[in-house]
Amino acid sequence: MAFIWRRRSTTIVKLVAFALAIWFCIAFLVYTDDTRRRAAQEGAGASGAGSAPGVGGGAGGLGDPIALALRNEPAGEDFGINGNVIGGGGQKQAHDEADIPPTVGKHKADLQAERMRKKAAEQPKKKPQEDSKKVIDPPANFEENPGELGKPVRLPKEMSDEMKKAVDDGWTKNAFNQYVSDLISVHRTLPDPRDAWCKDEARYLTNLPKTDVIICFHNEAWTVLLRTVHSVLDRSPEHLIGKIILVDDYSDMPHLKRQLEDYFAAYPKVQIIRGQKREGLIRARILGANHAKSPVLTYLDSHCECTEGWLEPLLDRIARNSTTVVCPVIDVISDETLEYHYRDSGGVNVGGFDWNLQFSWHPVPERERKRHNSTAEPVYSPTMAGGLFSIDREFFDRLGTYDSGFDIWGGENLELSFKTWMCGGTLEIVPCSHVGHIFRKRSPYKWRSGVNVLKKNSVRLAEVWMDEYSQYYYHRIGNDKGDWGDVSDRRKLRNDLKCKSFKWYLDNIYPELFIPGDSVAHGEIRNLGYGGRTCLDAPAGKKHQKKAVGTYPCHRQGGNQYWMLSKAGEIRRDDSCLDYAGKDVTLFGCHGGKGNQFWTYRENTKQLHHGTSGKCLAISESKDKLLMEECSASLSRQQWTLENYDSSKL
């Protein structure tokens, strides 16, 4: 029995020991699992604080937070489009990490990291990290750093509904592809478009003046505005920049309020000026100039990118002659892909205008080319585009800055161009300076003014600066000048400065411009068939060239029905000529070689005879199409009257 008891005791001890071992294992596993679950719950609570309801860490980060980003709206009162981590991350204050891109699908679950972030926020402000790249990370299959070296960013054709909405919202609000912009670094690299001639530092003076850079904006997209400013800071010698003055023309988007101030608080050269009401570009620029202190003012639009070496060539010209106004070559940044397009100095154009007082680009005239040994040398330009230029501050003041009676924008570039040349200055385009600009096909901004702003500004311009040549603009608007306000102070300015005449300007600065007064006829071209109420009608401009010219009921208001018959037999709409090559009658750039653009008006039969084809211009029975027919003097559909026809000018 003792033996049996001893065996049972040993077995019991073993069973108890085994049971204790199992209990300890179970207790350890339960404790570990509970710890993990509690940590995960705490982490989820921390990370969920910055997430939009119902948004998880979706692939590509294309949920609501991106839609917020593309709408330029913050997730909270003081948090802008950089205030959320896309895909469900913790909030970060915009002024701490405003240019650090949200990371798709990465959760900040560590509470210690959150405490460290809050502690860091209490420390003195530091400059935002310079390796920041973009606001949103690219979708799958995108290169890591899209848009570098100015390369295009092309979105996939197949997009999720969320992504498509975000893209569409960006286009609607900005008239360019904001979604693509938000994929690209605000410090992206660009190609160097300069000729070798430009890179010789010995060409530029060493004691160049400082400039204040004035950038006016209204509801500009976050990344585009930041990229503009950083391109100035990153590619300009620090000692040549006085201040970068950001003039807010009464923006109402939240990301342009405290978020913008917090971001640029780390950059002492950047100053933000707020307009107290919507002023428009012209008066916003005047406001910026009033806050400038440096000897040179440089104006840039808020959707630009400066390239390497852009500034020194501009300042050099002003340092040599303070009455020289200089413009960089304006390269095109695609509104869709943000690709940076540029051309070498041989392809540089100069500014002009037409008698609608609209700015236009033209090749450098042969007379100007002969003045230079290199195509990279600065060239005279009759006018400037107006958005990007540098000017001596005292000379700008002497010229009366901008006409404060101009509203919003339009015409200010021609006014400054005319008075620069007529009042003792020169206007140049500098091929060694390149700045990219996003050209939009429409304006995303709305004004409540019932006034035709462009016409009002243009009439003020014509009344002050164009002398007797103003009549050619008035013909284009049917002599309906409207209310242009009081220009007596601007006329006094011109008299006080003893400026030259507009005829001097045309003869010496822009002799290439066709003068309507030299034409044989100018005004409407009316067909006498089918009631005699149909006129030749076509919009001008390069984008309308090579399209069939149409007809429209005569309205006697100029515009698309204002034509000129030159002594050379051209039927002109400014720089476009009526052209017939055997198919449709179209507008084509005037080439001066007669041929397809040579027309003769037969006054006795009232026919327009085409030189190379031998046919006559007619209209269809439906009165909506031009025809070319075998000439027959008896057909009224081939008969035309030309307004202000004067055969003595032939």
Curated annotation (Swiss-Prot):
EC number: 2.4.1.41
Location of the region described as Disordered in the Swiss-Prot/TrEMBL record: 84-154
Segments passing through the bilayer: 12-31
Region: Catalytic subdomain A, residue numbers: 208-317
Glycosylation sites: 321, 373
Residues reported to bind substrate: 216, 249, 278, 302-303, 440, 445
Keywords associated with the record: Disulfide bond, Glycoprotein, Glycosyltransferase, Golgi apparatus, Lectin, Manganese, Membrane, Metal-binding, Signal-anchor, Transferase, Transmembrane, Transmembrane helix
Domain Ricin B-type lectin: 521-643
Binding-site residues for Mn(2+), renumbered to this chain: 301, 303, 437
Basic and acidic residues bias spans: 107-136
Residue spans, topological domain Cytoplasmic: 1-11
Mutant phenotype after disruption: RNAi-mediated knockdown in the whole body, in the mesoderm, the respiratory system or the amnioserosa results in lethality. RNAi-mediated knockdown in the epidermis or the digestive system and reproductive tract results in a reduction in viability. RNAi-mediated knockdown in salivary glands results in aberrant secretory granule morphology showing angular, shard-like morphology.
Topology, Lumenal side: 32-650
SS bond list: 198-432, 423-499, 535-554, 577-590, 616-631
PROSITE patterns associated with the record: RICIN_B_LECTIN
Region (Catalytic subdomain B) location: 378-440
Record field: catalytic activity: L-seryl-[protein] + UDP-N-acetyl-alpha-D-galactosamine = a 3-O-[N-acetyl-alpha-D-galactosaminyl]-L-seryl-[protein] + UDP + H(+); L-threonyl-[protein] + UDP-N-acetyl-alpha-D-galactosamine = a 3-O-[N-acetyl-alpha-D-galactosaminyl]-L-threonyl-[protein] + UDP + H(+)
Cofactor(s) the protein requires to work: Mn(2+)
Any one Pfam family match given in the protein's UniProt record, by short name: Ricin_B_lectin
UniProt GO cellular component terms: Golgi apparatus; Golgi cisterna; Golgi membrane; membrane
Domain notes from UniProt: There are two conserved domains in the glycosyltransferase region: the N-terminal domain (domain A, also called GT1 motif), which is involved in manganese coordination and substrate binding and the C-terminal domain (domain B, also called Gal/GalNAc-T motif), which is involved in catalytic reaction and UDP-Gal binding. The alpha subunit loop in the ricin B-type lectin domain regulates substrate specificity and modulates the substrate access to the active site. In isoform A, the alpha subunit loop is composed of positively charged residues and acts on negatively charged substrates. In isoform B, the alpha subunit loop is composed of negatively charged residues and acts on positively charged substrates.
Chain's role: Catalyzes the initial reaction in O-linked oligosaccharide biosynthesis, the transfer of an N-acetyl-D-galactosamine residue to a serine or threonine residue on the protein receptor. It can both act as a peptide transferase that transfers GalNAc onto unmodified peptide substrates, and as a glycopeptide transferase that requires the prior addition of a GalNAc on a peptide before adding additional GalNAc moieties.
UniProt similarity note: Belongs to the glycosyltransferase 2 family. GalNAc-T subfamily.
Name of this protein: Putative polypeptide N-acetylgalactosaminyltransferase 9
Organism: Drosophila melanogaster
